[in-house]
């Protein structure tokens, strides 16, 4: 008799456990299928790595080319408010950020390579800079449904560098070695000296993202947003450029909602 009661008790426990598991699975299934939108999107970016304001060392920007920067993203938006007005969006984005600039500078702190040796000092003349960095980015955004057609969104993004270029050259000028009154090294008659700070690009970036999207129909949408990097794109202890540079980009794209 005791054995029968024991078996019945075990059966009841197993049944209750199975029901609890089914409830958990159903709950998880409902979470990922109810009040949630999945989307993929592509974007084109215009901008660059820029200081905040014009440093006194940069006297003139002679040319600026943002190049062709492209991004792809997959994201999910979970609508959490009872009337579906507010949501939280989490995504994964592959994106490029780059630019080319030509500037005329004065007493611009830099480090160049001359005769296979690094020379640090204050440069006056022309500087060309090439930046091309690739990131994996995770945006974490709040979304507000303004109407059936319009959504507004904003929040933070966190980026991990996966490929990096930050280089260029100086020409048509001179460099004062170590100090603004140090030994003069001239670069004239087409003479150039290269620099390469690619290894000094910061591996982690974070910033803010603000934008809007317009639904063309049930599946397709157009979007635009602005991203601003809070931290310098170069490492904290890097001192061959004496001002901070931030990623500032305007992004325009389109998306498909499933």
Locate each region found by the language model.
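Transmembrane beta-strand segments of Gram-negative outer membrane beta-barrel proteins
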Residues: 30-46
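Residues on the lipid-exposed face of transmembrane beta-strands in outer-membrane beta-barrel proteins
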Residues: 42-44, 70-78, 92-94, 138-144, ...
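Cleavable N-terminal export/targeting peptides
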Residues: 1-35
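Outer-membrane beta-barrel channels and translocator barrels
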Residues: 33, 77-83, 147, 217-219
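Extracellular/periplasm-exposed beta-strand and loop segments of Gram-negative cell-envelope proteins
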Residues: 48-67, 97-134, 161-203, 231-249
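Early exported N-terminus immediately downstream of N-terminal targeting peptides
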Residues: 87-98
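Repeated loop/turn-to-beta-strand initiation elements of outer-membrane beta-barrel proteins
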Residues: 84-88, 149-152, 218-224
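Short connector loops at helix/strand junctions that flank enzyme active sites
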Residues: 67-71, 85-87, 133-137, 147
């Amino acid at each position: 008799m005791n054995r029968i009661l024991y078996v019945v008790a075990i059966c009841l426990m197993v049944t209750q456990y199975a029901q609890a598991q089914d409830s958990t699975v159903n709950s998880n299934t409902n979470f990922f299928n109810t009040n949630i939108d999945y989307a993929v999107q592509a974007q084109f970016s215009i901008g660059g790595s820029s200081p905040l304001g014009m440093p006194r060392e940069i006297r003139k920007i002679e040319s600026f080319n943002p190049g062709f920067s492209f991004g792809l993203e997959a994201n999910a938006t979970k609508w959490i408010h009872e009337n579906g007005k507010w949501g939280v969006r989490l995504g994964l984005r592959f994106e490029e950020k780059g630019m080319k600039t030509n500037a005329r500078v004065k007493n611009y702190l830099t480090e160049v390579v001359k005769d296979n040796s690094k020379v640090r000092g204050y440069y006056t003349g022309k500087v060309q800079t090439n930046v091309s960095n690739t990131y994996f980015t995770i945006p974490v955004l709040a979304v507000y449904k303004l109407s059936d057609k319009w959504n507004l969104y904003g929040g933070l993004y966190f980026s991990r560098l996966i490929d990096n270029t930050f280089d260029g050259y100086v020409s048509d000028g001179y460099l004062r070695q170590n100090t603004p009154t140090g030994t003069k090294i001239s670069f004239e008659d087409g003479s150039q000296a290269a620099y390469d700070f690619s290894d000094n690009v910061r591996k982690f970036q974070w910033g803010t993202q603000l934008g809007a999207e317009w639904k063309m129909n049930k599946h397709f949408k157009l979007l635009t947003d602005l991203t601003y990097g809070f931290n310098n794109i170069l490492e904290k202890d890097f001192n061959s450029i004496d001002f901070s540079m931030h990623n500032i980009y305007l992004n325009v794209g389109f998306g498909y909602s499933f």
